[in-house]
Swiss-Prot record:
Annotated protein name in UniProt: Protein Nef
Phosphoserine, modified sites: 6
Region (Acidic): 62-65
Annotated phenotype, changing residue 124 to R: Complete loss of Nef-PTE1 interaction and Nef-induced CD4 down-modulation
Region described as Binding to ATP6V1H: spans on this chain: 148-180
Record text about domains: The N-terminal domain is composed of the N-myristoyl glycine and of a cluster of positively charged amino acids. It is required for inner plasma membrane targeting of Nef and virion incorporation, and thereby for infectivity. This domain is also involved in binding to TP53.
Location, primary (coarse class): host cell
Keyword Repeat set for record: no
InterPro entries to which the protein is assigned, alphabetical: HIV-1_Nef_anchor_sf, HIV-1_Nef_core_sf, HIV_Nef
Processing and modification events after translation: The virion-associated Nef proteins are cleaved by the viral protease to release the soluble C-terminal core protein. Nef is probably cleaved concomitantly with viral structural proteins on maturation of virus particles.
Gene this chain is encoded by: nef
């Protein structure tokens, strides 16, 4: 009656199949690579460093050896709604991002840390493009980017102790709108996908 692989009683297979069936879907708003991970369980040939900016960025980070000297400690997976909410609250409890001035370099460091420790591909932390408050495209991520008042930026840059390369001193050079932004926790973003309402095209 068939080979040993034709039987459903292969040790452990029913548990693996059930685990695959119960895998959480990727959160709304994640990138193409995370969609591949959700659908196929791996990065497909349609997403390479040549065709996908997130893959190219990650490859460059690994080649430069900046950031973290370790390889991912867990399997690669897409960011899910539950994981985004949990990560947001974890960072809030640890006091990690609240009020921290945003820069692309700081976002890259956060993405690399999460990639290496949690296995989430770094294409999930994207924000709406307009000036003003930037809302996360990934549903469940509870940090939005809020412009810092110009007088606070000027106050931070007064005196002799100003650090020229600190993100607040760069006056928004990383930002297309030239705004100085800070991460701000907003628990309502776990229940209300503002980015989807403002930009249904994403």
């Amino acid at each position: 009656m068939g080979g040993k692989w034709s039987k459903s009683s292969v040790v452990g297979w029913p548990a693996v199949r059930e685990r695959m069936r119960r895998a959480e879907p990727a959160a709304d708003g994640v990138g193409a690579v995370s969609r591949d991970l959700e659908k196929h369980g791996a990065i497909t040939s349609s997403n390479t460093a040549a065709t996908n900016a997130d893959c190219a960025w990650l490859e460059a980070q690994e080649e430069e050896e900046v950031g973290f000297p370790v390889t991912p400690q867990v399997p690669l997976r897409p960011m899910t709604y539950k994981a985004a909410v949990d990560l947001s609250h974890f960072l809030k409890e640890k006091g990690g991002l609240e009020g921290l001035i945003h820069s692309q370099r700081r976002q890259d460091i956060l993405d690399l840390w999460i990639y290496h420790t949690q296995g989430y591909f770094p294409d999930w932390q994207n924000y709406t493009p307009e000036p003003g408050v930037r809302y996360p495209l990934t549903f469940g991520w509870c940090y939005k980017l809020v412009p810092v008042e110009p007088d606070k930026v000027e106050e931070a840059n007064k005196g002799e102790n100003t650090r020229l390369l600190h993100p607040v001193s760069l006056h928004g050079m990383d930002d297309p709108e030239r705004e100085v932004l800070e991460w701000r926790f907003d628990s309502r973003l776990a229940f209300h996908h503002v980015a989807r309402e403002l930009h249904p095209e994403y």
